[in-house]
Amino acid sequence: MAKDQKIEKANNFSGTLKRIIKLMFTQYKVSSILIVFFALASTVFGIVGPKIMGQATTELFEGLVAKISNEGSINFEKIARILLTVLGLYILSSLFMFIQGWLMSNISQKMTYDIRKDISKKINTLPVGYFEQRTVGETLSRVTNDVDTLGQSLNQSFTQMISNTAMVLGVLVMMFTISPVMTLIALALIPISGILLGAITKWSQKYFKSQQDMLSDVNGQVEESFSGQNIIAAFNYKEKSVKEFNDKNNQLYTSSWKANFFSGLMFPVINFVGNLGYVGIVFSGGLLVSKGTIGVGDIQAFIQYIRNFTQPIGQIAQSMSEIQKMAAAGERVFEFLDAKDEENAEVLETVTNKEGNVVFDKVKFGYVEDQIIIKNFTSDVKKGEMVAIVGPTGAGKTTMIKLLMRFYDINGGNIYIDGKDISKLDRSELRSYFTMVLQDTWLFKGTIMENLRYGRLDATDEEVIEAAKAAHIHHFIKTLPGGYNMELNEDASNISQGQKQLLTIARAILADKPILILDEATSSVDTRTEVLIQKAMNKLMEGRTTFVIAHRLSTIRNADKILVLKDGDIIEQGNHDELLEQKGFYSELYQSQFAE
């Protein structure tokens, strides 16, 4: 939406509302039923009050007339009984309103809590492709802003809609019992209000949807600016970054003020229509009293009912504003929860002895089905072999690893691990084969010990320390304040890039998996650290199948097999010396890197 500025309504407004209500009455059935009961009971007691209060007014008026004409006096005892009855009704109404408000707040918070749990589970079941097609900010916006909006709007709108709808219907009944003529005048307000509300709702709904989408874009922009701050500064990109943010922020501002402006029109419009109704009621009521058709107390009660009639219509209008926000946010949340999970085969095979033999058999793949980028990939990798995958950018090196780990499913051919077709293996079991060391080191906020133990959660402290020693990082850790208990910050910026790389290698050593993936593992560290890493890697790779993706060909001279990719196909295979002798594409790449 940020790209083409198209503003549109929620795709399935009524469907989203039905799903939210169904969720309420399915997962929180008892509380939801009690909410409806207490909301209706509170409304009924509030509706009866004015009619009974009118009796007190009539009694007082008739008593005054009788006293003036010396025919009687005011019956204060009867008036007191009436007022005590009304007081009791209003106390019960307020008590029931408090109970339903407490229950509704509890349900909305539980729903928010449960949806966040569902989203957390969902994140771990979605394919990698889902996240590669969306920004981090967009996903975060659904987890935070959209879920919060859903919960808050539900809390503010659901009981109001029940109470106000019941109030309107109940008040109509009470008004008919007083005067059908004045009631018909009041009813004339409904179609006028409905037409105006319909027009306002139509305009405001599309802007509420736009507001939620633009908020997602702004979050994405902020996240990118924060995570890429060093790059932005290095390339003197600050002004353009600020401009891009301001553009998105302005779009959010425009959508937000339009949404709130149109929704804000609802109450004053309804209030204006209600005031017109008062004029008609006072005029017709005066005529009816003069004819003796109704009493003075009836007019007092009817005017109170008119207020109780127009006020809930205005509150319904305000509730519609919240419901529109709830629907827009709910649609985005449900869209995330309904996203297709990674699929497993119906009949799963198991592997009892994990060795690490890998076979690519005529593999074909394209991110878009009609745009195949890997056309005919075939290779046989034996247990313990080191296989380097090289080629220019876009040749399909990283894609091959994603296919091996089933982050994506292939379009043709087969991939086998230890004789088992990976499409027949459970994804979690398949991925238990692998450990990875990437150039983009990922360390979470926590202690160094916790980060290393992420490789194997049941590892003892001694095993973690041994892995650190094997990765030549133990001595450095001991020099840090707190040693293994030192806390890394959110992006581990309180240690160097080389140290982060060594920690990820130690984590991989601790994981002790049969297949190792190295993606540019030594391309962002200094020479001394690279030597330490290479020593640790040589030990780690012993007896393990290793796939190395690197542009620096000097790091893969000792590979058992080098696969040279170009345009998705393996055009050359062999070890370093054999490929140089062929004087083909690999030789050209190698010579170009070492040309003076």
Regions found by a protein language model. Name each.
Residues 345, 351-596:
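ABC-type nucleotide-binding domain
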Residues 1-46, 61-82, 99-104, 108, ...:
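Membrane-integrated ABC transporters
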Residues 174-188, 258-331, 336-337:
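Helix-loop-helix
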Residues 2-10, 109, 117-141, 145-147, ...:
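Short intracellular "coupling" helices and adjacent cytoplasmic loop segments at the cytosolic face
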Residues 30-55, 86, 101-105, 151-166, ...:
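Alpha-helical segments in transporter systems
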Residues 49, 53, 100, 104, ...:
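Hydrophobic/aromatic residues in alpha-helical transmembrane segments
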Residues 27, 31-44, 89, 156-210, ...:
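Transmembrane helices of ABC transporter permease
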Residues 22, 26-29, 128-129, 147-154, ...:
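An intracellular "coupling" helix at the cytosolic face of ABC transporter transmembrane type-1 domains
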